[in-house]
Amino acid sequence: MAAGERSWCLCKLLRFFYSLFFPGLIVCGTLCVCLVIVLWGIRLLLQRKKKLVSTSKNGKNQMVIAFFHPYCNAGGGGERVLWCALRALQKKYPEAVYVVYTGDVNVNGQQILEGAFRRFNIRLIHPVQFVFLRKRYLVEDSLYPHFTLLGQSLGSIFLGWEALMQCVPDVYIDSMGYAFTLPLFKYIGGCQVGSYVHYPTISTDMLSVVKNQNIGFNNAAFITRNPFLSKVKLIYYYLFAFIYGLVGSCSDVVMVNSSWTLNHILSLWKVGNCTNIVYPPCDVQTFLDIPLHEKKMTPGHLLVSVGQFRPEKNHPLQIRAFAKLLNKKMVESPPSLKLVLIGGCRNKDDELRVNQLRRLSEDLGVQEYVEFKINIPFDELKNYLSEATIGLHTMWNEHFGIGVVECMAAGTIILAHNSGGPKLDIVVPHEGDITGFLAESEEDYAETIAHILSMSAEKRLQIRKSARASVSRFSDQEFEVTFLSSVEKLFK
């Protein structure tokens, strides 16, 4: 009897859920239709707003070209791409209106342009309008101690919405890697959309790190020690990679900065028909003006690192390798070496990172041999590179490495990480001659630095000449040609 009652209750429960199926389907369908109508209405309003923005004082329609670059005042390689891209477009389309969406609310537009000239020696030929975004904190990694990739990506949608509400462009280019803004501007804003990818938000290498339970800056030790958490994170990464591929595929034009980035974007976005390698612009000519003499303006040897103070740049590896080298030199003879770390700080997190690096050099007892130069002018950067014997780079899987190219053009012997863009595109033989060195571990770096310093001046000069000859393919002029060719589709 009890079994019969349970069976009857189960049937009754199933009938109840079945009775809700069709009403639920109707409700869901109605909500979807309402959502589509609302979004379509917003799109129509934005199209009307776009016409008002693009109409000039003389009544003619002007094309509005916008770049999404929330950290345009940061002073890194990505910002150099932004200013060179703007300059190239202004030369070809002088009648267009140019807009930059930025979150640098602590400065004005003129200060941003002056900073671009001071750091990169770039001056635009036509005015640029800056749209200042108040919600940039939504893409700060410090806001998301867990699920950082997802948090920042969702935050970028809200930041993109703020940008779209203030200015609706005809052509939208994401120049900083916020792929989740692409469908927003394409389907809601009705824009032609393009993207310049410096570094994929997620890569197959990151998946491998989690899968193999290796410790990394994106994989905490407590996760690697727990098989269950590793599995959960791996599922999260695979789901995120799938969504990242969907939003990225919305782009009409995709530009990537290296062979390494190309391989990852092709596997994730699957838009090979509209994807091209556009090497980032490096001001090689300015550095090529530095005479190729053996650096004897200062006693001893100067080692220089150029790169923003971000965690993935792995500056601690440079300091530890340098300390290991100094310890060996102190045994042999008094050291005459100095390490100068040059880079930009975007925010308080970067400033805190610099302070941690200072403490690390103190803990290792090498503080008097290590200097930090933050947000320095371009002329000062050039002066340091002209004096340096070795240029250091330690980022694992660096997407490209503008700092690496600048060091080579300036005549330093480059010692870069044996991965990513430096390995595949930059520190490669030129006409059969070596152009620099690659390393991975702390010991590798220390030993290779010692090897470079032990070389004769003539041998170093030969490597420096080969390196200089190889970097012409990364010039501003080459960038302009390939960039304009790639984005041409957006203007048809």
Curated annotation (Swiss-Prot):
Q: What does the annotation give as the result of altering L86P?
A: Decreased GDP-Man:Man3GlcNAc2-PP-Dol alpha-1,2-mannosyltransferase activity
- Record GO cellular component, one term: endoplasmic reticulum membrane
Q: Where are the transmembrane segments?
A: 20-40
Q: Which domain of life is it from?
A: Eukaryota
Record's subcellular location:
Endoplasmic reticulum membrane
List the molecular function annotations (GO) for this entry.
Answer: alpha-1,2-mannosyltransferase activity; GDP-Man:Man3GlcNAc2-PP-Dol alpha-1,2-mannosyltransferase activity
Membrane-side (Lumenal) residue stretches: 1-19
Q: What does this protein do?
A: GDP-Man:Man(3)GlcNAc(2)-PP-Dol alpha-1,2-mannosyltransferase that operates in the biosynthetic pathway of dolichol-linked oligosaccharides, the glycan precursors employed in protein asparagine (N)-glycosylation. The assembly of dolichol-linked oligosaccharides begins on the cytosolic side of the endoplasmic reticulum membrane and finishes in its lumen. The sequential addition of sugars to dolichol pyrophosphate produces dolichol-linked oligosaccharides containing fourteen sugars, including two GlcNAcs, nine mannoses and three glucoses.
Specify the protein name. GDP-Man:Man(3)GlcNAc(2)-PP-Dol alpha-1,2-mannosyltransferase
